[in-house]
Structure formats: structure tokens, C-alpha cells
Curated annotation (Swiss-Prot):
Protein name: 2-oxoglutarate synthase subunit KorB
Gene3D superfamilies recorded: 3.40.50.970
Pfam families recorded: TPP_enzyme_C
Leading EC class: oxidoreductase
Organism of derivation: Archaeoglobus fulgidus (strain ATCC 49558 / DSM 4304 / JCM 9628 / NBRC 100126 / VC-16)
E.C. number(s) listed in UniProt: 1.2.7.3
Catalytic activity as recorded in UniProt: 2 oxidized [2Fe-2S]-[ferredoxin] + 2-oxoglutarate + CoA = succinyl-CoA + 2 reduced [2Fe-2S]-[ferredoxin] + CO2 + H(+)
CDD domains tied to this protein: TPP_OGFOR
Molecular-function annotations in GO: 2-oxoglutarate synthase activity; thiamine pyrophosphate binding
Quaternary structure, from the entry: Heterotetramer of the KorA, KorB, KorC and KorD subunits.
Positions in coiled-coil regions: none
Top-level taxon of the source organism: Archaea
Keyword field contains Oxidoreductase: yes
């Protein structure tokens, strides 16, 4: 293992539990490189939920919190409000983020709280056996849709934009350097940032890892700054980067206003 990664990992916890060829390692390495580009580890907190992606906090040698299913953003919100000077990064799977955690996701977007959400989207529930998820493509066969999925899937990037996130990007596991840059930009951005990483599951989707990466390379195209109505499921890029008032700042302004009023009453 390269020293540039080992210094940021709990090496005693390795090897990971991830299946051979799982793209989660690509995302993990991209995050480490993003942090090395300009952030202090001691001022960065990493939060995760439940699922294959949730194990990322087990391997990172940061201050980490491994939370309950769908509630990673709720925990992260509390951390950020208590310690707004910290960089808070949240790793979630697609099921964790937009199924059981869907309400937390859209309200974090709406509030525009200064968090970075990295959503690893493999289009199914991997840890529990390959079941149907809200992101499973229409027609896809899973353990719980053996004849094909009849539901329309969520487009996570479009959902984030529509709900109010101020930075939204999407890339695939085939573009680790683009993932790195997007996470770096998201951590720099002052507001709620969503970086969706489209991956896949070699085990449950029964695809060779090399073929999965080839699929991601050949079927996705980069289109930056595309309007919400024009974004397609196979588009990747930075779709939104907008300066908006941040939630913690609004809370602090309110707190100061209330304290000022209380002081007047006590005169």
C-alpha cells in the first residue's frame, strides 16, 4: 500500500470487507487525495450510515461516526451546528441516502447546511443481498424484482438540485481524478454539497469489475452546468455551483438577534 494512503487509514482494520472489484475503494482513495489537497485531518469529521459504503468510516483514520440506517445526515447536522468550524463529510449509499434517509436528504438540501454528502450509487442494496432500491433502473432484475423493476428510479443529482443543494456533481467510478476534484470542490464550497458517484456491484449484478468500468466509460458523458430539465441519467459533471446563504450562519444571526433583544429587555 502506498504511504500516501496508509497514513490516512486504520491499517489494522484492513483488508476491507468489500468484495473483490468493489468500486468503494476507488471512492475511498479519491477522498483521501482530496483531503491531502488542502484540508486538515484533525478538523475533518467523517460520518456514514449503514450499508457497504458505511464501512468507510471504519477504515479512515479520522474522527469518524458510524451511525444508524438513513440517519447519517441527521448526525452530521448536529455535529456541524455544534462545531461549525469543522469540515463534515458524509458517506452514504443510494439506499441509505434516498430511501430510508430520503427525508433527511431533501431537508439537508433545502437548508443548505455546510456539509459534503458523497452518495455512492450502485443502484441496489448490496450488503443485504442485492435487493431493489429507489435508484434501480426500470426493467432491471434484482433479488426482489426477478421479472424486472417496474418503478421509475430516482435521479439523485436532479433530486438534490430540485431540493435546493448549492453544489451538485456526478461522476462514475471510472473517473477517480474527477471524483477527487469534485470532493475537494465540495469541501471548499460553503453550503450543502452533493457528489454522486455512480458505481455498480460486481457480486449482485454479476458483472466482471473490468466490464463494469468499461460500461461506465462507454455509457456516460460529461456535460457541465446542464439545466435541471436537461440532465440525463447518463450525464456526469458539475451541474450546479451556486453561492447561497448557509444554514449555520442563519442560525447564528438568529441567535445574536435574540440575545440582543433579551439584553434590551434586561436593561
Amino acid at each position: 500500500m502506498k504511504a500516501e494512503y496508509a497514513d490516512y487509514l486504520r491499517t489494522e482494520m484492513l483488508p476491507t470487507i468489500w468484495c473483490a472489484g468493489c468500486p468503494n475503494g476507488i471512492v475511498l482513495a479519491s477522498f483521501i487525495r482530496a483531503v491531502k489537497r488542502g484540508f486538515e485531518r484533525d478538523k475533518t469529521v467523517v460520518v456514514s450510515g449503514i450499508g457497504c459504503s458505511g464501512r468507510i468510516t471504519q477504515y479512515l483514520d479520522f474522527e469518524t461516526v458510524h451511525t444508524t440506517h438513513g440517519r447519517a445526515l441527521a448526525f452530521a447536522t448536529g455535529i456541524k451546528l455544534a462545531k461549525p468550524e469543522l469540515n463534515v463529510v458524509v458517506f452514504m449509499g443510494d439506499g441509505d441516502a434516498v430511501a430510508i434517509g430520503g427525508n433527511h436528504f431533501i431537508h439537508a438540501c433545502r437548508r443548505n447546511i455546510d456539509l459534503t454528502a458523497v452518495v455512492i450509487n450502485n443502484s441496489l442494496y448490496g450488503m443485504t443481498g442485492g435487493q431493489l432500491a429507489p435508484t434501480t433502473p426500470e426493467g432491471a432484475k434484482t433479488k426482489t424484482s426477478p421479472y424486472g423493476n417496474v418503478e421509475r428510479p430516482f435521479d439523485i443529482a436532479k433530486l438534490a438540485i430540485a431540493a435546493g443543494a448549492s453544489y451538485v456533481a456526478r461522476f462514475t467510478a471510472y473517473q477517480p481524478r474527477w471524483i477527487e476534484k469534485a470532493i475537494f470542490e465540495a469541501m471548499q464550497h460553503h453550503g450543502f454539497s452533493v457528489v454522486e458517484v455512480v458505481t455498480g456491484c460486481p457480486t449482485h449484478q454479476r458483472i466482471k469489475p473490468a466490464d463494469l468500468l468499461k460500461h461506465l466509460k462507454e455509457n456516460f458523458r460529461r456535460r457541465d452546468n446542464v439545466s435541471l430539465d436537461e440532465i440525463q441519467p447518463t450525464d456526469i459533471g458539475v451541474f450546479k455551483k451556486e453561492v447561497m446563504e448557509e444554514f449555520c450562519e442563519k442560525i447564528e444571526k438568529l441567535r445574536m438577534y435574540v440575545r440582543k433583544g433579551e439584553n434590551k429587555e434586561n436593561v
